Amino acid sequence: MYLLPNTTTITKSTMPHPQQPHAILEGLCKEQSLALAPEMVDKLVEYGRLLEEWNNKINLISRKEDAPIIIKHIFHSLLITQHHTFQTGEKVLDLGTGGGLPGIPLAIIAPQATFLLVDATGKKITACQEMIATLKLTNVTARHLRVEELHGETFHTIVSRQVALLNKLCAYGEPLLHEKGKLICLKGGSLEQEIKQSLEASQKHHGFPARVEEHPIDEVSPIFSEKKIVIAYR
């Protein structure tokens, strides 16, 4: 059993039907004052369907879900916009994108920015490329490569949902960040030591991060218990 905002209780016997993701997503976004155009909601729901479909073929996300994909993965990704506004012409890198998270949901609601999704696993990138094509997204591309291969490219923002330690993500991201760029991570658990280590190692990475912010999101929904948005700044 899990809870949605406003303490709506859902059990396995009352799990959302396929026609309900629109209402669930719209309700959650309204709770957070996140205004989405109807066509954005349509694409986000369609992405959720595609993600589940591809996940049955290859391992993109856990197959033992305790909450609908539209909440646990897609809405979770959208919460980044509570702490960062994507600007026109902004270049964004999704580091270790897996099944397109958080990059594809963010690209859907921020068409003014351009997104590059990278992952070292070819079959995951193939899935992302197929989903991007199906969704007809023109501001996002997916490439099969390791982050070390992105020589000479710079980004205003790097986002990541992968489980690597913050210190490691900062080491990967620093050479790719614009001089006023930031790294935004979706993380969970106790992060005090992880953040401390990244700050202590900053001199190895040209002073990055100069500071780190931690934003708990457990008040949004119990589904996100112990989940945080972590932002590392130049």
Curated annotation (Swiss-Prot):
Query: Known SUPFAM superfamilies for this protein?
Result: S-adenosyl-L-methionine-dependent methyltransferases
Q: Where in the cell is it found?
A: Cytoplasm
Superkingdom in the source lineage: Bacteria
UniProt key word Acyltransferase: no
Q: What is its EC number?
A: 2.1.1.-
Q: Which UniProt keywords apply?
A: Cytoplasm, Methyltransferase, rRNA processing, S-adenosyl-L-methionine, Transferase
Functionally, this protein is described as follows: Specifically methylates the N7 position of a guanine in 16S rRNA.
NCBIfam families, sorted = rsmG_gidB
* Family per similarity comment: Belongs to the methyltransferase superfamily. RNA methyltransferase RsmG family.
Write the protein's name.
Ribosomal RNA small subunit methyltransferase G
